[in-house]
From Swiss-Prot:
Keywords noted in UniProt: ATP-binding, GTP-binding, Nucleotide-binding
Originating organism: Bacillus cereus (strain AH187)
Name of the protein in its database record: Nucleotide-binding protein BCAH187_A5316
Source species taxonomy: Bacteria, Bacillati, Bacillota, Bacilli, Bacillales
NCBIfam families: PRK05416.1
Function: Displays ATPase and GTPase activities.
HAMAP family (alphabetical): RapZ_like
Disulfide bridge partners, by residue number: none
GO MF assignments: ATP binding; GTP binding
SUPFAM superfamilies in alphabetical order: P-loop containing nucleoside triphosphate hydrolases
Domain of life: Bacteria
Coiled-coil residues: none
Chain sites annotated for binding GTP: D65, L66, R67, G68
Length: 293
């Protein structure tokens, strides 16, 4: 087993209905490998997998749901074993909320409390709170989510567990060809098939928007300049609002017929325009599929 002082492990637990799902999604956005409902008895084996992953699992968030006293024995043993290792220090994040808030959340979702499947949720909440007393005492961080919206809980987790780099809002700008389908992960799609097409100029047909001759041709038209002005205006207006809403990344897709000339040119342009302010990744999905529209 290889030691790695850079390995981070966060164990997420707490009251049912306090926000564990939102918390796991937040860690996933921060690049953590996330596992929900991991039985505590499997924790030692999972730690071995982390150590042997050669850096592929150096940030892990585990959602552990403790529904019975027998689970505690396995968890305490695993945590005590971890305390003897120097290469990994687990952080326990305990999510809590007022009883009244938890009851309201269960009523809103029409779900039964796991410890009171056929009874009143308050009875299940009381039983769970008693079970989790020791776990809460051992937690590094306790978050009361009673007055937090999901977005606010995410912001707290990002603030507590991310580096400045990880907090960066990422913008992915990609070109594509409509003939190959719209990217399924696109948040915003722009169609530039109305622009003059270099495909019909024989010597440009085998080239792409990465070639200066093609990009110069596409960018020389007045309609291209007007479109780029409006597009950059719109995108720069929207990005801060998307970021404020808690999105960790935005995928902007620009398409032409074959994804080789016009869309590539405009994707490169938009990427360069946004890079001074944002973490931007530019890609061209279909540029190598076929040289020609």
């Amino acid at each position: 087993m290889t030691e790695n002082n850079d390995i981070k492990m966060v164990i997420i637990t707490g009251m049912s209905g306090a926000g564990k799902t939102v918390a796991l999604q937040s860690f996933e956005d921060l690049g953590y490998f996330c596992v929900d409902n991991l039985p505590p008895m499997l924790l030692p084996k999972f730690i071995e997998l982390m150590a042997d992953s050669k850096g592929k699992m150096n940030k892990v968030a585990l959602g552990i749901d403790l529904r019975g006293r027998e689970f505690f024995e396995h968890l305490w043993e695993a945590l005590d074993d971890l305390s003897e290792r120097t290469w990994i220090i687990p952080h326990i994040l305990f999510l809590d909320a007022k009883d009244s808030t938890l009851v309201t959340r269960y009523k809103e979702t029409r779900r039964s409390h796991p410890l009171a499947p056929t009874g009143l949720p308050l009875k299940g909440i009381e039983a769970e709170r008693n079970l989790l007393t020791d776990m809460k005492a051992r937690a590094n961080i306790v978050l009361d989510t009673s007055d937090l919206k999901p977005k606010e809980l995410r912001e707290k987790i990002v603030h507590l567990f991310s580096t400045e780099t990880e907090q960066a809002f990422r913008v992915n700008v990609m070109s594509f060809g409509f003939k190959y389908g719209i990217p399924i992960d696109a948040d915003l799609v722009f169609d530039v098939r109305f622009l003059p097409n270099p495909y019909y100029i024989p010597h440009m047909k085998p080239l792409t928007g990465l070639d200066e001759e093609v990009s110069s041709y596409v960018l020389k038209f007045n309609e291209t300049h007007k479109f780029l002005e409006k597009l950059t205006d719109l995108i720069t207006f929207m990005l801060p609002h998307y970021k404020r809403e808690g999105k960790s990344q935005l995928v902007i897709a620009i398409g032409c017929t074959g994804g080789q000339h016009r869309s590539v040119t405009l994707t490169e342009y938009l990427g360069k325009h946004l890079k001074p302010e944002y973490s931007v990744h530019v890609s061209h999905r279909d540029v190598e599929k076929r040289k020609g529209h």
